[in-house]
Amino acid sequence: FMGLVGSEMCIRDSFNLIDDRGNEFLPDQFKGKWNILFFGFTYCPDICPLTMKQLSDVKEALSENSNKMRVFLVSVDPDRDKPENLRIYLNNFDDEFQGLTGEIDQIYKFSTQVNAPFFPVVNSKEPNYTVDHSGSLVVINPEAQYAGFFRAPHDTNKISKALASLLN
């Protein structure tokens, strides 16, 4: 776990996203629990489903402590990842996982503040395009501050242990 301190933790620029139920999502909504974010997309053939499965395993390993955290998939492909698509996709892993999407510029503004870069694809004519994105898991603390990240490849046991110490 790469933890951060001080001014690195600020999410300086506000952003406005849409959750998987079609409601507005603002940075303050991260408050109250630890938040694990993965920036990916539902059409991703490999790293995204693997990572979401790993997060499901981590949540299971944390058992009763898992109610102190939330898991989010932040879409880097809003052209295809509409709120209802995110909800259906996430239900394959855990029905408590939450999806965020929105305007590409808002997603990009957020992703760059939390070291989860991606290369936006806009209005692609190719139906099966992919999006190059970070494999890191972003950690947002209960004060809605960027707290650090887990770099890929992910070890479910190490992540579970690190999160267990954060959640206690």
Question: In which residue ranges do the predicted regions lie?
Answer:
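Single conserved hydrophobic/aromatic residue that forms the stacking wall/gate
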Residues: 1-6, 10-11
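Short loop/turn microsegments at loop-to-beta-strand junctions
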Residues: 12-13, 35, 134-136
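Hydrophobic beta-strand positions
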Residues: 16-17, 139
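Short, ordered coil/turn segments that flank beta-strands lining enzyme active or ligand-binding pockets
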Residues: 20-21, 142
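Short active-site neighborhood of thiol/selenol oxidoreductases, capturing the structured segment around
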Residues: 25-51, 55
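Solvent-exposed coil/turn segments that connect beta secondary-structure elements
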Residues: 42, 74-79, 104, 115-116, ...
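Structural microenvironment flanking redox-active thiols in thiol-disulfide oxidoreductases
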Residues: 50-110
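Thiol/disulfide oxidoreductase modules built on the thioredoxin-like
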Residues: 106-162
